[in-house]
Amino acid sequence: MRHRNGLRKLNRTSSHRLAMLRNMTVSLLKHEAIKTTVPKAKELRRVVEPIITLGKNPTLANKRLAFDRLRDRDIVVKLFAEIGPRYATRPGGYLRILKCGFRVGDNAPMAFVELLDRPEVTEAVEIEDAAE
């Protein structure tokens, strides 16, 4: 019986699944929004949320744990300098999963995964005066 085995295998070996989720975690923390399939997004949430919780308390032990899970120094620095303090008062629920239709090739359900309360990036739009 598979009772209480909530892990999604995603049709991968355990090492492939671990590497894929690690890479997706690094990409999400780097870009703060990624597009992936819905099952991968739901499994990614189980990995990313505890790592962001580590980032809220910048002790040496937590930094070592985060590096052990992420294996990217720049992302660990960003986690403890920017992302952790941003969610200091939020008790969990750092991600938003938005369904965005189906992939063209195989009709897989797709989703955007984004960090909540991320800074809005607006591009400067030049306005040309009609008088010129």
From Swiss-Prot:
Alphabetical list of Gene3D superfamilies matching this protein: Ribosomal protein L17
Residues that span the membrane, as ranges: none
InterPro entries: Ribosomal_bL17, Ribosomal_bL17_CS, Ribosomal_bL17_sf
GO biological process, one term: translation
Any Pfam family hit: Ribosomal_L17
GO function terms (MF aspect): structural constituent of ribosome
Sorted UniProt keywords: Ribonucleoprotein, Ribosomal protein
Recorded GO CC terms: cytosolic large ribosomal subunit
Family (UniProt): Belongs to the bacterial ribosomal protein bL17 family.
Subunit structure: Part of the 50S ribosomal subunit. Contacts protein L32.
NCBIfam families documented for this protein: L17
Protein name: Large ribosomal subunit protein bL17
UniProt source species: Dechloromonas aromatica (strain RCB)
Gene name of this polypeptide: rplQ
